[in-house]
Amino acid sequence: DLKDNMKREYPSVYQEAFEIATEWAYRQSQINMAYQQNRIVRVPYDPNLMVYTCRDIWWAWWWDDTSIRFFQIFWNEIRWIDYREWSWYWMLYVLTNIIDQKPYKYAAHIWPHDMRVHEQMSWKTRLEVAKEAWYEFTLVESPNWAVSARINIVRDLFSNMRFDSKNCLAWLNKIKNYKRKRNESTWQFM
């Protein structure tokens, strides 16, 4: 409506400017709540629990970026114990020098649907590289859900999550500052 458009275009007080700046942040309030509830603390590796990994992969014609999150499940609690990210490394390097060097006992490696893309360095798919390295993994196909539905699933699970305050800090800062995009012509969130 006109009032919201005016506030967005011409914030008149600092509170309106702050609301506009933080309005598009998906997870900022959830991260703040996790700090208040002491769910962002040191979360050590528990050798009695298996570790799961999940990845995020970005690819551009000039580089490959990847991140790995390490978590354990204890009853209904998801414990994020570690996070690593890197650029310009082959998948084989990541498998042998990052995954294998951790003291963790792994239950499963969850890979995103885009494992079928070719690595810039080797021109093999990440799937081929992982199979050549004898890695067992679960390939997650993206369900054909709306972005908002996927966001709500994570929002529902978020209260059951604890994060290691040291090992996961870079990831927490990234997701805290992640902003949703808006179509400039319709002002609808995408």
Can you describe what each PLM-predicted range is?
Residues D1-R55:
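ATPase catalytic-site recognition across NTP-hydrolyzing enzymes
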Residues K3, W61-D64, W88, C168:
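Active-site-proximal structural scaffolding
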Residues Y14, D56-W61, E85, H113:
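Short, flexible loop/turn elements at secondary-structure junctions
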Residues R27, V41-R42, W61, M91, ...:
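Polar low-complexity intrinsically disordered regions enriched in Ser/Thr and small residues
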Residues D46-I73:
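Gly/Thr-rich phosphate-binding beta-strand-loop-beta motif of the actin/hexokinase/Hsp70
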Residues R69-F189:
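Mg2+-dependent endonuclease catalytic cores in nucleic-acid-processing enzymes, primarily RNase H-like
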